[in-house]
Each structure stands twice: as structure tokens, then as C-alpha cells.
């Protein structure tokens, strides 16, 4: 018998080719070096945000992830995210699957910026600059 006659629909050929190309692209990176580069960027962003008077959650001096969660003392996190989005920056807001922790901290949500292999230092600098402008205008 031909077992292929029992498969419904078209095989996911394009998806398999795309997945293979994505894996090849990821193999082109030295992931340890990329991780170190991204952690350095996240640590710099955290330092800049603290200097602007924002609360940064996490220990960025011993940072092991390229993620910065922060909160401005007077600008709502959802408003901050909307303003950043309108300026071309994609961030996340809300509980980030950590609602019990945020409840314990007495906050309703944070803004989270995440950096990955396709992000540059210049983009991080642009994010910080936009946050400075937003803070000056709306705080």
C-alpha cells in the first residue's frame, strides 16, 4: 500500500524549507559572542533608563538576558508603549506572565524591551533617545 494516500492536504514543503533556511542563518552566528553583545546593550539601556529616573526591574549588573523591563514613575506603561510604537519601536507591556510578582511589587505592569541578534547598538541608542523625548514631553 501507499501510505501517502492517507495524508490530508499538501505537505508543508515551504515551511520545511523556510525552517531549514532559518537554522542555517542562526548557524552563521557565534551565539556566545552575540549573547555577550546583546547583554552589553541591555545593560547600557538599563543604566540609561535609571539615569532618567525610571525603575528598572532586574539585576543588570549581572545581566544574563538581553531584556529590560522598566516603568516610568508618572507615565502609564501602556501609554509609553503606544508612544514608542508610534515612533517605530516594538516593546511589550503588561504582566509578562509574572502577575503574582508584579502584584507583590504593587505595580500593574511594565514596559519590556527585548534585544536579539538582529538588533544594533544604534537601535538601542534610538530607543533611549525616544524615551528621553517622551519623558521630557509627557512627564
Regions found by a protein language model. Name each.
Residues 1-139:
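Pyridoxal 5′-phosphate
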Amino acid at each position: 500500500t501507499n501510505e501517502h494516500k492517507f495524508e490530508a492536504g499538501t505537505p508543508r514543503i515551504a515551511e520545511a524549507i523556510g525552517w531549514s533556511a532559518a537554522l542555517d542563518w542562526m548557524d552563521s552566528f557565534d551565539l556566545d559572542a552575540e549573547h555577550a553583545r546583546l547583554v552589553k546593550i541591555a545593560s547600557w539601556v538599563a543604566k540609561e533608563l535609571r539615569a532618567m529616573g525610571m525603575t528598572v526591574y532586574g539585576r543588570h549588573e549581572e545581566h544574563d538576558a538581553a531584556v529590560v523591563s522598566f516603568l516610568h514613575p508618572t507615565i502609564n506603561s501602556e501609554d509609553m508603549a503606544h508612544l514608542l510604537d508610534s515612533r517605530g519601536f516594538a516593546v511589550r507591556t503588561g504582566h509578562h506572565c509574572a502577575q503574582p510578582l508584579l502584584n507583590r511589587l504593587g505595580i500593574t505592569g511594565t514596559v519590556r524591551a527585548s534585544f536579539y541578534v538582529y538588533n544594533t547598538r544604534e537601535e538601542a541608542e534610538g530607543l533611549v533617545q525616544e524615551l528621553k523625548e517622551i519623558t521630557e514631553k509627557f512627564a
